């Protein structure tokens, strides 16, 4: 379960050095401190090491760093391997991996631990099945949500053939009982059917509390497996899952995730508990292999929020956005148009009330949308989720809250996503966009409608962050109705932006809008010829900067004959050409 070093053989300084390998700064503490908030109850450091029965114990993922430390100090290490690696089981993999999946699986099998980062739709579950069959040890698949248990069970039953050599359970009279343990067991979701061969469990169901002390404990069955696969392993920093992984003596521990980065900064804990990142699948390569064009449509709302005050919190801004009638009408119109064009839209909102309002507006427009929120009874919600595959040819719009459609939501025919409330974290965007990335017959293009509220600096900055993530995911960005124009509006990186930007300015036919935090004379000089050319053709040019320019920048503005305005309260950095091309 962990690496144990005898405490008696270590000096206090050596103990601190070794325990330091499993210790890192707590981002939450420093975040609160920088914002002058209370740090009560927030430790400065997060320590995953322990003192157990005369040993210093550190997570298995620290092995490489420990060996490096020992080499630097001239110490020779001797290992006693007490991990679980017996009870070999006859298993065969019944499927066939795609070439890119085979490469990923072979890379993982080189190591006894580690994380595979693969985007949604790559086939992490199938690769997990291949790892289980290849290793042939009792396996435990740990998932964060019960919805994933069903997915894993169906895939494992489909792809793995397991030879069951267990003695049959007999009745008190010696007859073979009709109730035999399952081949593939389930722990969680209201069931406790343990197989001992291959089991799937939610991590919440693997731990409990000591009846006498109240201390958290792990169920004994965790110690019976030679292989552990932690699906959506970015949850490994959760206290319950951390406890489970630190108590499991399995020889092999693998983590699978589309987003191994954590928004709270606890990413280091993942590599300590599951091992380092061993294989990463590039989302751009996945898009090429799938042959599915990825497009993002920025929808500039142009709204103003009279009640907005500088310094308002994100939740306060979100309240104003969700209540804005014109913005909601824009979202509803886009969803209806997508559905009428034969697409399958999914509208996601952070707020339950907002989702309900969009649902109502869609119904008022004569559509029959599907609503999924946490308010719906669990039984009814399950029935709705099970019925969704039947609506493929009806093109009904699904309206849901982000929190409800977390890991485990799988509807491969979805091809259009409308992000009704702003997000910025890379992992959230990747997860939401991943709803569209599953392969499906006839799927050739997926689209994301991104609603951009430039009037609020915080939301403008969030949009800039989203653009970077879209670029990493292989998306093209365009606003024009004609999809054939998408190629001309591809996301550009910093290595060749200037030539393309100048070309877009020269080819402008209506107007150019530029907003920047400051004006640089060097940058203005590089854009001087193209801006002057557009202005002489009668193209409207509006430039807004957030700080007064220096004299050299003022001179370039004067030479071009272009006016600018200063808005100190804004920090927007964007260029919009002809209300279509976005920088």
Positions of PLM-derived features:
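Conserved pre-motif I regulatory segment
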Residues: 47-51, 69-72, 76-117
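Conserved SF2 helicase motif VI
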Residues: 118, 260, 424-448, 466-467
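Conserved Walker A/P-loop ATP-binding site and its immediately adjacent core
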Residues: 126-159, 350-355
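Conserved helix-turn-beta segment of the N-terminal RecA-like "Helicase ATP-binding" lobe
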Residues: 147-191, 366
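Conserved helicase ATPase core of P-loop NTP-dependent helicases/translocases
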Residues: 150, 184, 192-195, 346, ...
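Post-DEXD/H (motif II) to motif III coupling segment of the RecA-like Helicase ATP-binding lobe
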Residues: 226-227, 234-297, 470
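Conserved interdomain hinge at the start of the Helicase C-terminal
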Residues: 309-350, 356-361
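PLD/PLD-like phosphodiesterase catalytic module centered on the HKD motif
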Residues: 485-583
């Amino acid at each position: 379960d962990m690496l144990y070093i005898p405490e008696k053989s270590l000096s206090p300084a050596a103990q601190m050095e070794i325990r330091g390998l499993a210790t890192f700064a707590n981002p939450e503490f420093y975040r609160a401190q920088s914002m002058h908030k209370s740090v009560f109850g927030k430790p400065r450091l997060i320590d995953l090491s322990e003192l157990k029965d005369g040993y210093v114990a550190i997570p298995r993922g620290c092995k490489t760093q420990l060996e490096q430390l020992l080499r630097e100090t001239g110490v020779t290490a001797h290992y006693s391997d007490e991990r679980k690696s017996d009870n070999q089981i006859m298993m065969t993999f019944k499927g066939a991996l795609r070439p890119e999946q085979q490469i990923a699986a072979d890379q993982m099998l080189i190591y006894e631990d580690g994380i595979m980062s693969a985007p949604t739709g790559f086939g992490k579950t199938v690769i997990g099945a291949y790892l289980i069959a290849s290793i042939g040890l009792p396996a435990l698949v740990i998932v964060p949500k019960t919805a994933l248990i069903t997915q894993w069970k169906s895939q494992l039953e489909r792809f793995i053939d397991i030879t069951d050599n267990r003695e049959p359970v007999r009745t008190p009279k010696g007859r073979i009982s009709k109730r035999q343990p399952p081949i593939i067991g389930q722990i969680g979701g209201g069931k406790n059917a343990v197989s001992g061969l291959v089991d799937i469990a939610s991590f919440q169901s693997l731990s409990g509390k000591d009846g006498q002390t109240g201390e958290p404990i792990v169920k004994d069955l965790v110690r019976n497996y030679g292989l552990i696969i932690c699906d959506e392993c970015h949850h490994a920093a959760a206290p319950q899952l951390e406890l489970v992984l630190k108590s499991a003596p399995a020889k092999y521990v693998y983590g699978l995730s589309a987003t191994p980065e954590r928004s709270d900064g606890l990413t280091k804990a993942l590599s300590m508990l599951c091992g380092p990142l061993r294989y990463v699948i590039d989302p751009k390569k996945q898009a090429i292999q799938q042959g599915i064009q990825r497009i993002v449509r920025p929808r500039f709302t142009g709204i103003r929020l009279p009640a907005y005050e500088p310094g308002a919190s994100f939740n306060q801004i979100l309240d104003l956005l969700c209540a804005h009638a014109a913005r909601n009408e824009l979202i509803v119109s886009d969803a209806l148009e997508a559905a009428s064009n034969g697409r399958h839209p999914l509208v996601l909102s952070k707020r339950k009330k907002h989702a309900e309002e969009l649902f109502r507006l869609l119904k008022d427009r004569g559509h029959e949308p599907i609503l999924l929120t946490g308010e719906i009874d669990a039984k009814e919600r399950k029935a709705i989720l099970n019925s969704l595959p039947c609506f493929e040819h009806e093109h009904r719009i699904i309206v849901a809250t982000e929190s409800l459609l977390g890991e485990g939501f799988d509807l491969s025919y979805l091809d259009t996503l409308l992000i009704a409330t702003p997000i910025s974290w890379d992992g959230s965007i990747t997860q939401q966009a991943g709803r569209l990335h599953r392969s499906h017959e006839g799927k050739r293009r997926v689209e994301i409608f991104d609603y951009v509220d430039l009037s609020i600096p915080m939301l403008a900055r969030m949009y800039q962050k989203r653009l970077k993530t879209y670029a990493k995911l292989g998306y093209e960005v365009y606003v024009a109705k004609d999809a054939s124009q998408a190629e001309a509006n591809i996301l550009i990186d910093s290595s060749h932006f200037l030539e393309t930007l100048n070309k877009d300015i020269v080819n402008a036919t209506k107007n150019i809008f530029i907003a920047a935090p400051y004006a640089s004379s060097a940058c203005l000089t590089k854009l001087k010829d193209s801006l002057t050319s557009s202005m002489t053709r009668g193209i409207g040019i509006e430039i807004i900067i957030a700080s007064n320019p220096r004299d050299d920048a003022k001179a370039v503005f004067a030479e071009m004959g272009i006016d600018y305005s200063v808005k100190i309260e804004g920090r927007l950095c964007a260029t919009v050409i002809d209300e279509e091309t976005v920088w």
